[in-house]
Amino acid sequence: MSHSVKIYNTCIGCTQCVRACPTDVLEMVPWDGCKAGQIASSPRTEDCVGCKRCESACPTDFLSVRVYLGSETSRSMGLAY
């Protein structure tokens, strides 16, 4: 099963989500669209276990984790949309 971490434009670049991830799915990348100049990205979504520690660590409720079941069906696991 694949998990995808959805990233939105309210990231403050604090890196708390990156540090909270037990499988190192997240990393910070340059991003001009936020004040911090960097944003959390999830290049290794296949390693995500859906624990939502990144969501819990995020001070701005910025992240959303979704579980994709098959090609078109999804079940939301996130808090922020």
From Swiss-Prot:
Pfam family, one: Fer4_7
Annotated [4Fe-4S] cluster 2 binding sites: C21, C48, C51, C54
Domain 4Fe-4S ferredoxin-type: 2-31, 37-68
GO molecular function: 4 iron, 4 sulfur cluster binding; electron transfer activity; metal ion binding; oxidoreductase activity
Enzyme category, top tier: oxidoreductase
Cofactor dependency: [4Fe-4S] cluster
Cofactor: how bound: Binds 2 [4Fe-4S] clusters. Cluster 2 is most probably the spectroscopically characterized electron acceptor FA and cluster 1 is most probably FB.
Keyword set includes Kinase: no
UniProt key word Iron: yes
EC annotation from Swiss-Prot or TrEMBL: 1.97.1.12
Record key words, sorted: 4Fe-4S, Chloroplast, Electron transport, Iron, Iron-sulfur, Membrane, Metal-binding, Oxidoreductase, Photosynthesis, Photosystem I, Plastid, Repeat, Thylakoid, Transport
Gene Ontology CC terms, in alphabetical order: chloroplast thylakoid membrane; photosystem I
An example Gene Ontology biological process: photosynthetic electron transport in photosystem I
Topology versus the membrane: Peripheral membrane protein
Taxonomic superkingdom: Eukaryota
Reaction(s) the record says it catalyses: reduced [plastocyanin] + hnu + oxidized [2Fe-2S]-[ferredoxin] = oxidized [plastocyanin] + reduced [2Fe-2S]-[ferredoxin]
Subcellular location, record wording: Plastid, Chloroplast thylakoid membrane
Binding-site list for [4Fe-4S] cluster 1: C11, C14, C17, C58
PANTHER family: PHOTOSYSTEM I IRON-SULFUR CENTER, PHOTOSYSTEM I IRON-SULFUR CENTER-RELATED
HAMAP family per UniProt: PSI_PsaC
Oligomer status and interactors: The eukaryotic PSI reaction center is composed of at least 11 subunits.
Function: Apoprotein for the two 4Fe-4S centers FA and FB of photosystem I (PSI); essential for photochemical activity. FB is the terminal electron acceptor of PSI, donating electrons to ferredoxin. The C-terminus interacts with PsaA/B/D and helps assemble the protein into the PSI complex. Required for binding of PsaD and PsaE to PSI. PSI is a plastocyanin/cytochrome c6-ferredoxin oxidoreductase, converting photonic excitation into a charge separation, which transfers an electron from the donor P700 chlorophyll pair to the spectroscopically characterized acceptors A0, A1, FX, FA and FB in turn.
Name the record gives this protein: Photosystem I iron-sulfur center
Classification lineage: Eukaryota, Discoba, Euglenozoa, Euglenida, Spirocuta
Gene (name only): psaC
